[in-house]
């Protein structure tokens, strides 16, 4: 096998290298979901800048005694003689290590927002202010990493927070872009469209998950081989990932809501209320208090935890009542929809039927993922100045209360062109979907007269498109696009 490399993140890597090369005090905030590559980014930047290895400490979700015990364990591992007995000593230790030229990284920093640990922020503030006052004489720095953006913001960006306005730099890591993901898969697995869709639906752009599959030599294997190795063996690395890192954070709260949205992507507020507050057909409508509670749950899951996202039709205002809810993270959605129950049944059911069941459920979920992947490809091509469709608006779907549904609407002001797309995991369904697509597009154009005089294009998107289907679409005046067609400019 070819050795694993460092994929993507080139801009973030350059930014972090520049920070490390300043030879003066820095305090960096790095946020992003768990496993997204925050620690790997730091390690790579340290390696390229020739700095001494950083001192990494992962903060546990615990009380002060648990945190101090974990810190002392790390210190022993690094062969350092210091030990800490209080949070004040921990803050002072960080200051001393930074003055010695170390890069100190505190992972899961958001746990310091917990009441038993919050005093540490004031203690750290005192050290940070001293270091900032001597910035040109301090050769080291502090990096804080966190996976809950809202809690990191509360600790570092809230005006009343002790550490407000203390950071010198901020980085936010999102999923790997499609070009980097294609480079990774081209090197280690292959870029057959069906494989890419399967992996993206399951892992999205989380490099750690791809590396886990690579290390078990199943990244290039069949769907069921990969599922078995990653989820259904006793040593499977991702068997407890969602429960430990996503659902465990919630401690059992919001389970019903998360499962419903995962199984019904695109649910409206009314759909969720009906499903979660009405036990039967003859039940009373939900009370106002129940509606408020459900609204509060949705707000927490969207704004605090970022597990759910509310999407709007293209051109809709933020206050529009046509919003639809989706699980934001592909891995969490795949776990809730297809993997959680089969994995839980391993101890009392034959293994192979469970893997087959999970595979079939994942395949069903890939239809919605295809829409998201195609939209992401359009955006990435436009951002890079590639392809022939420069976007002037965020690409999105369109729907209304009258039943009009369009998978993707892409707008190009430069070329005065608007493109309507139908996405089908099964290419054989594309030809038959065009009549409905064109009818819905006409309703859209009547709704938005500003596009009169623009060129309207129609597009059929599938993972692969055979010559026969391509020709049939072309006879209807429809552009056929496979995933390979879409990402080809990224591979050139």
Give each language-model segment a name.
Residues 186-244, 252:
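Amphipathic alpha-helical "lid/sensor" segments that cap RecA-like P-loop NTPase cores
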Residues 5-16:
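N-terminal pre-P-loop "Q-motif" helix
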Residues 323-492:
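A cross-kingdom feature that marks ATP-driven nucleic-acid transaction machinery
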Residues 168-195:
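Conserved small helical "lid"/interfacial subdomain of P-loop NTPases
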Residues 51-55, 60-82, 95:
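Conserved NTP-binding/hydrolysis module of P-loop NTPases
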Residues 227-403:
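Accessory nucleic acid-recognition modules appended to NTPase machines
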Residues 25-43:
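Walker A/P-loop nucleotide-binding motif
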Residues 31, 111, 116, 120, ...:
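Sensor-1/coupling segment of RecA-like P-loop NTPase cores
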